[in-house]
């Protein structure tokens, strides 16, 4: 079977992504901005308002993942490194994997929580591991998008929580997603999985279900992080 090698970044304004039906025939008209590209060549197949600056929610985390995976590749951090959770990370709101202050957790489990559950607590913890603080990590994220030549992206946080001055475009997100998949295909071992567990062999087992419901139905697609752009 020939695998589909298309990377889809679609920006929805009228339909919250968590309740979007895959079969919705009106998905294109309800998207305020969107793009479809070939992940290998980068060729644009379809676009709608691709350069409009919009809020990108959890798709923000793709840039963070690139930076984290770069550090793993360099050996600065390792998959099996055990991290002690900070109060700052544990107190994060929004989507979470519910890590607790002082808890011990591996880099691999944090990345699993980021990729599958879009955990804000997990990404902030990894930002602190890599750069010492979220603020310093965000500076590195903005440096990365400039290196990629992106002109319609600026980050204020690493979570994607809505803040003034935090935005991107569907084109920029597609470039970021392509960079992630092509240079770090290992991310797919997390993002293409529909369900898994954290702390599986403990009394505090936590069930992870991928926030991207497309994973359950279309396993041939390159799946990254699904967010809602406004």
Stretches with model-predicted labels:
Residues 21-171, 178-182:
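Active-site-adjacent loops and short helices of periplasmic peptidoglycan-processing enzymes
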Residues 1, 150-154, 162-167, 171-230:
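Domain-terminus/edge residues, biased toward the C-terminal soluble/receptor-binding domains
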Residues 3-21:
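Sec-dependent N-terminal signal peptides of Gram-positive bacterial secreted proteins and lipoproteins
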Residues 3, 52-55, 81-83, 92-94, ...:
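A generic short-segment signal for beta-strand/edge and adjacent turn/coil regions
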């Amino acid at each position: 079977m020939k695998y589909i090698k298309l990377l889809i970044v679609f920006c929805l304004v009228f339909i919250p992504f968590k309740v979007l039906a895959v079969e919705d025939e009106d998905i294109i008209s309800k998207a305020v901005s969107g793009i479809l590209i070939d992940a290998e060549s980068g060729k644009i197949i379809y676009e709608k308002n691709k350069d409009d600056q919009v809020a990108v929610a959890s798709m923000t985390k793709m840039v963070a993942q690139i930076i984290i995976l770069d550090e793993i590749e360099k050996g600065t951090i390792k998959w099996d490194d055990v991290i002690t959770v900070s109060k700052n990370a544990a107190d994060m709101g929004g989507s979470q994997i519910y890590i607790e202050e002082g808890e011990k957790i591996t880099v691999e489990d944090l990345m699993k929580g980021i990729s599958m559950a879009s955990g804000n607590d997990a990404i902030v913890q990894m930002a602190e591991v890599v750069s010492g603080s979220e603020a310093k990590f965000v500076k590195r994220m903005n440096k990365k998008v400039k290196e990629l030549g992106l002109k319609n992206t600026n980050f204020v946080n690493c979570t994607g929580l809505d803040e003034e001055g935090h935005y991107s475009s569907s084109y920029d997100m597609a470039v970021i997603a392509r960079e992630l998949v092509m240079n770090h295909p290992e991310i797919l071992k997390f993002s293409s999985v529909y369900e898994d567990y954290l702390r599986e062999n403990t009394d505090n087992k936590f069930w992870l279900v991928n926030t991207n419901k497309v994973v359950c139905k279309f396993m041939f697609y390159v799946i990254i992080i699904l967010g809602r752009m406004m």
